[in-house]
Amino acid sequence: MEVFKDSDVLISTLGLDSHVWGKVPIYMTSGGFDPLHIGHARCILETTEMADADGGYVIVVVNGDGFLKRKKGGAFMPEEERAEIIAGLRGVDAVLIWDDGTQNV
């Protein structure tokens, strides 16, 4: 699946513009995934199972390197590698690397 750094590009690429928004279920989960552990895997699996039952999309938000630097002093793995791992998991439709300069997701 694809990795995005721009939410507008993600929305248009998946065809989730205004005429679809609100009609197709979108399931999202987020985390640092630095490194990916069993709790993350279970959370993503549960999210994909709910989306599968609903015919929805799964978007996983990966906290960017800047977010992790502010939170814990740095990242163990670069954001691109963490996002690539998540994108390779079954049921994940898209990954968004997110860092807006705050600790908000």
Enumerate the language-model features and the residues they cover:
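Nucleotidyltransferase catalytic core that binds NTPs
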Residues: 1-105
